[in-house]
From Swiss-Prot:
It comes from the Bacteria. It catalyses: tRNA(Glu) + L-glutamate + ATP = L-glutamyl-tRNA(Glu) + AMP + diphosphate. This is Glutamate--tRNA ligase. It comes from Pelagibacter ubique (strain HTCC1062). Its cofactor is Zn(2+). It holds the Pfam family tRNA-synt_1c. The lineage of its organism: Bacteria, Pseudomonadati, Pseudomonadota, Alphaproteobacteria, Candidatus Pelagibacterales. Zn(2+) binds at C99, C101, C126, D128. The gene is gltX. Belongs to the class-I aminoacyl-tRNA synthetase family. Glutamate--tRNA ligase type 1 subfamily. Its EC number is 6.1.1.17.
């Protein structure tokens, strides 16, 4: 039995779609589970839309979520000659033919199909056309000659056996009239040359699979195993598209979703193992199988993603969380100065308790990350004469404290509450605004302890405040 080999084959025409990430993950996990190999093929034959920057971003995105590939990337555009050679061989052996139908004729056929509310299938007009009767002024396309008798059976490892009438499969184009190969030819030749044993992809590819199976048979190549996974839908039950919000991997990393959390979510999106919800990477590899993939579409639930992300934020240690925060800020916010580590890292113990994303942590930690406090007019309006007196007196009392903790700070706050006949908010709010620039955020004592005596005194002496 051949060693398992799977692949992920994105087109570098834009950011990596979340559905593609799940497909890559399932292929990667299956190959790892079987001690096989996982390959990345860049399908860049659309020269107008394919960009190097998209290819680079796809590779970075896969790496971000923990998916690595074996060997170098397989670049489809470098194999076009091989694709063309196979097309010519199919033509020579009678498994393909030249089609001279004009674009106007094809459009008319499509129009009639739409009027009858039927799927378009080429009418095979040129299938048996003799070369001597072919028009000389039209450059032909080459179509594959489908074996139209009988049925084709796809032995799908997820969907089970799927059977269709061969007459419903059109004689599809394999070479355009400019000599360039089409998707179904290129993908089939590549999969054969790469020795792929398992093709795991979305179930919107099923009709392509029936076409590609006929190429395999015509070329006397061994068929790989096929597994078609259900598509991802929106929470409303519609097919997820690139136009939907949060449809690309970048959309999730940008708001501070952690790689492990998103990988865990995508693993469970359409796959299950007993009633287990949280999987380590090691468990994912050991337990993943194709039998656990369901047949129905799965709904993308942002609230569930946030809940999982919150779980990961709260359960990983502060050293790991700090590393994630540093990387996140470097890409999407502002680079954290190395000297801030000693203040931020201990503060993560309380900062992560109110956070669902890395962005939440960043927003709550701004007062530590940045030395200069930025105030909004609406918050400064809350600093009246009474608030200024509270800030000034707290600063004076703080000088006598050597160790900052709740036990040393609470008596000072309670004295001020009593003296100014107010409540905790009456004391805490002006202090919080003076120290962080906001009336919201972490607990007052946590803020003071994390900043330290010297920095607290400096900020409470800010002329903008007092």
């Amino acid at each position: 039995m051949s060693k398992v080999a799977t692949r992920f084959a994105p087109s570098p025409t834009g950011a990596l779609h979340i559905g593609g990430v799940r497909t890559a993950l399932f292929n990667w996990l299956y190959s790892k589970n079987k001690n096989g190999t996982f390959h990345l093929r860049i399908e860049d034959t659309d020269k107008e839309r394919s960009k190097d920057e998209h290819k680079i971003q796809i590779i970075k995105s896969l790496k971000w979520i923990g998916i690595d590939h074996d060997g170098d990337e397989y670049i489809q555009s470098t194999k076009i000659n091989d694709h063309v050679n196979v097309a010519n061989e199919l033509l020579k052996n009678g498994h393909a033919y030249k089609c001279y139908c004009s674009s106007a004729e094809i459009e008319e056929q499509k129009k009639r199909a739409r009027q009858k509310k039927l799927p378009y299938v080429y009418n095979r007009k040129c299938r048996d056309l003799q070369e001597t009767n072919a028009p000389t002024i039209i450059k032909p396309v080459i179509r594959f000659k489908i074996k139209i008798e009988g049925t084709s059976v796809l032995k799908d490892l997820v969907q089970g056996d799927v059977e269709i009438e061969n007459t419903t499969i059109e004689d599809f184009i394999i070479l355009r009239n400019d000599g360039t190969p089409t998707y179904n030819l290129s993908a089939t030749v590549d999969d054969h040359q790469m020795k792929m044993t398992h093709i795991i992809r979305g179930d919107d590819h099923k009709i392509n699979t029936f076409k590609q199976m006929q190429i395999y048979l015509a070329m006397s190549w061994d068929l790989p195993n096929f597994a078609h996974i259900p598509l991802i839908h929106t929470i409303e039950g519609k097919k997820l598209s690139k136009r939907d919000n949060a449809s690309t991997l970048d959309d999730y990393s940008k708001i501070g979703i952690m790689p492990d959390a998103l990988r865990n979510y995508l693993l469970r999106l359409g796959w299950s193992y007993q009633d287990k919800e949280i999987f380590t990477l090691k468990e994912s590899i050991e337990l993943f199988n194709l039998e656990g993939i369901g047949k129905s579409p799965s709904k993308l639930d942002m609230s569930r993603i946030l809940s999982l992300n919150e779980h990961y934020i709260k359960t990983i240690n502060e050293n790991e969380l700090y590393d994630h925060l540093v990387k996140y800020c470097e890409i999407y916010k502002e680079k954290i100065k190395p000297e801030k580590e000693t203040k931020i890292k201990p503060s993560l113990i309380f900062l992560k308790n109110k956070a669902k994303t890395l962005e939440d942590i960043f927003n709550n930690a701004k007062y530590i990350i940045f030395d200069d406090v930025k105030f909004e007019d609406k918050d400064l309006e809350l600093i009246d004469d009474k608030a200024k007196s509270i800030i000034k007196e707290f600063k004076e009392k703080l000088i006598s404290i050597n160790t900052l903790n709740k036990e040393t700070l609470e008596p000072i706050v309670n004295d001020l509450i009593k003296k100014y006949e107010t409540n905790f908010k009456g004391v805490g709010q002006p202090l919080r605004i003076a120290l962080t620039g906001s009336k919201f955020g972490p607990g007052l004592y946590d803020i003071i302890i994390s900043l330290g005596n010297e920095e607290v005194e400096r900020r409470l002496g800010n002329k903008i405040i007092i």
